[in-house]
């Protein structure tokens, strides 16, 4: 085996592996990328029910209630970004850090009736922290400008929204 | 004696020593001045002593509750147990950077002590590179994240630590993981030194490999420990979430695994030299970017450093110098390295090349998946995320040929192999793998888990049969087998063990893909069944812990009416931090984990119900057990005489004396 043929073999193996890696990556990207959406974006152009998205916003104060579906507990709450609110259904135990009036990110699909069924709810934050996506959304909707001090207190901000949404 | 000022001074002293350690040996080596080069080990050891003292000072500050130190005030509290006061030192940004540089200094010290048989010039250059990296990060520590900053006025008590982090698993996870990350600095330094020298030979491969293997063992342990922690602490029933922090440790592990294998080719056959040097540089570069970019939040969000832009800019500059510098040197000098060993594609070398290509392809996929969301955020302004479905779909198909090649590779001879002959050694293993395939069809569902499971059995069977063949089972007498067992190099035993460990981990992952869970809401005394087991909620009671209130459940699990175990999952409420944590209860028989979590309480009186999450996780412990076996395999091959630096020299000296 000469140096040239050996090199040829290595190049072929490299191309095959890198090619299949690229093909797999692209295929996986096309079906598995998860977009982040705020409730107002969901209301404006709802994604198709087979598309998984991440929905982020504030849990509307006083909206959490429980439904029992055949012995399985379902948590229902509304997530808002100050413009619109989406009803979220989640089967399972809400994370330890889940609070009404605080930010939350839910992974799931939008149903035909406009509700959101979550397969996972994330609330990895403490009293002061909010997920970056939610903070960005707040800035985008003009609820908070970082140039003028800290983010508004989550609970007060949210009751304000709740009233606005109600009225 | 151990105040923060002394610690600060010692850190500054270590930084100066590291700078000298960088400059003097390099200058000496270029002038061929043996005295200057000979200074390097002394400088490395004194830098280690100064840094060790500095670290000790920080530990003493935390232990003695010196809340005038900003770092201690922000992360410790009087009521914290002593163990967590000590381990809490590296549970925050400043302390972990200090620990990082300390481990780097320990590596330098180890090269000085164990590298006595290296040529002086090479050792000097290796230590100089390590010193340079050290100096950079100590400067980062001193200028932007000083762990010894004082605060005035000093608070009466510290702010305490996240209760989630008060866990022995997490306490020892960072040092082990960091040792893995930082350990790859030594192969990196060897690679840069070889590029400066313009020479890579079999001896270089022999010197580099033990360091790479040692770092790889630590990284393997660190990843397994981190995954185990998230399994039993976070209570989601998952073990790997493919989030950027986890991927940051997996990426250098993949290239590090490739490095450990390609260095064998350099050592035995003087081939793949340029590639091995590149892998050494890439692995350490990934370690560096992993620890610093991801952990400090640059990757997650480019704006996370907004409150302290100096830190982000400094770290980016440092990464650019280390990674850019070494790659430039590589581009300049690599063409002068030529390989001599010729081999056919079907040979041990060929299979190692295939292993490297596949590992690097998997690595490229993981890098793409990790980097794509932040780049999309930056360029297109769209927030997206990729998760488990993406990584599963893209990496598992690439793992299958890797597993297949793992079994064949060790059976192939060097240089040129005859396929028919090799396959005749593998009949038994293939038979066992076929049985495994049938078992997998019976037990598992889904094409990928079945294929992975059968291939994992194949890897284990092929590794065992390879060892059996080498020690001559069935060919020679019992005495002959014993003799051969003693003569079989430990690195062969280690390789077999590591491959078996990989097989065990893959089997564990396949088992976990079949995990079942149920979320139920029950009254006390009610029974629900999950996958053949009956789970009964016997009782729930409240109690008061040292700094929390807890709700504890008693859940009895019966299989066909026979009591298996009683689980006691808890929910703890830490009032001072206003945080709740979930204490998972796990019953394991090393085949199946029964995993119970208690959620919220609803209603009052007779109508009180509790939400429970019940998991049945087949083969879960095997995932971490396999990691441990892999690391033990690595450690075993480290104990091989041939791997110990300088051993060949001694052996040849003895042979000469005998002659």
Curated annotation (Swiss-Prot), chain A:
Pfam families: CcmE
Periplasmic side: 29-167
Compositionally skewed regions (Basic and acidic residues) per UniProt: 141-150
Subcellular locations according to the entry: Cell inner membrane
Region feature Disordered, mapped onto this chain: 141-167
GO cellular component, one term: plasma membrane
GO BP term, example: cytochrome complex assembly
Membrane topology according to the record: Single-pass type II membrane protein
Residues in the Cytoplasmic compartment per record: 1-7
Membrane spanning residue stretches: 8-28
GO molecular function (one): metal ion binding
UniProt xrefs under SUPFAM superfamilies: Heme chaperone CcmE
Keywords attached to this entry: Cell inner membrane, Cell membrane, Cytochrome c-type biogenesis, Heme, Iron, Membrane, Metal-binding, Signal-anchor, Transmembrane, Transmembrane helix
Alphabetized InterPro entries for the sequence: CcmE, CcmE-like_sf, NA-bd_OB-fold
Annotated residues for binding of heme: 125, 129
UniProt family annotation: Belongs to the CcmE/CycJ family.
Entry function: Heme chaperone required for the biogenesis of c-type cytochromes. Transiently binds heme delivered by CcmC and transfers the heme to apo-cytochromes in a process facilitated by CcmF and CcmH.
Name this protein carries in UniProt: Cytochrome c-type biogenesis protein CcmE
Species name: Gluconobacter oxydans (strain 621H) (Gluconobacter suboxydans)
